[in-house]
Regions:
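Short, non-transmembrane alpha-helical segments in secretory-pathway proteins
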Residues: 2-75, 117-139
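Phenylalanine-focused residue identity feature
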Residues: 23-26, 42, 61, 78, ...
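Generic signature of intrinsically disordered, low-complexity segments enriched in small/polar residues
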Residues: 26-29, 45, 62-67, 93, ...
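Exposed beta-strand-loop-beta-strand "reactive/processing" segments of non-cytosolic proteins
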Residues: 44-107, 151-158
Length: 215
């Protein structure tokens, strides 16, 4: 029986293969249909669809989330409550520059690319992952709180202390989160790492407000 880590590695490998296949097909279709142009609202950061010929699928990561009920009434710490969604996202790069993300999900038992986009998120995320990640980024988790429209990068320390978080642009905007400058090391302050307690109240309020809007 595979361990949870081995299962994630197998899942990641299968999802990566699907992302690569899907992107190759996407590039062929876009060049065939729109060569020499760029359709309005194109999901990736290129100036011409021909640029896609030089783009590739880079690394991927699973998407985690926290149940809104656990945010409103915490039963544990933020990290412990995070669970995988079953969705993977893969960074797409061109000339070593992020141009967007591919979203991959398992549908009827088969991994498939379901969407492209997130050009701004890809740049924000890649910069933070390079700054905070170890060699294989195994110390990082991407956590999306759907009901607060907020994304966080969890950064686990190597010494077993409580993980800290880098709020991504969506979280910085939605929660009016300021970069940490009074706590942690100089490197932490520069990278914008905060404790979960520093955004818990704002996150709870955002989730509560958004859930109320759907009633």
């Amino acid at each position: 029986m595979q361990t949870p880590l081995q299962l994630q590695q197998t899942e990641g490998s299968d999802a990566s293969a699907a992302a690569t296949r899907g992107f190759a097909e996407f590039v062929r279709n876009q060049i065939q249909a729109h060569a020499g142009t760029l359709p309005e609202g194109f999901p990736l950061d290129v100036t011409d669809v021909q640029d896609l010929k030089d783009a590739r699928i880079a690394y991927g990561f699973p998407v985690y989330t926290v149940n809104p009920k656990d945010i409103l009434t915490p039963r544990s710490d933020f990290s412990s409550m995070a669970r995988p969604t079953g969705v993977w996202r893969f960074l797409i790069s061109r000339d070593n520059r992020p141009i967007g993300l591919a979203t991959v999900e398992k549908i009827n038992g088969t991994w498939q690319t379901t969407s492209y986009g997130g050009a701004g998120l890809s740049k924000d995320l890649d910069a933070l992952m390079q700054f905070h990640g170890n060699a294989n980024r195994s110390n990082l988790r991407f956590i999306r709180i759907f009901q607060a429209r907020s994304d966080f990068l969890e950064v686990a320390s190597g010494n077993g202390t409580t993980p800290r978080f880098a709020p991504l642009q969506s979280a910085r905007e939605a929660l009016l989160q300021q970069r940490a400058s009074k706590t942690g090391s100089a490197a932490d302050a520069a990278g914008g790492l905060v404790d979960a307690s520093q955004f818990a109240e704002s996150l709870r309020a955002a989730v509560q407000a958004n859930l109320a809007n759907f009633r």
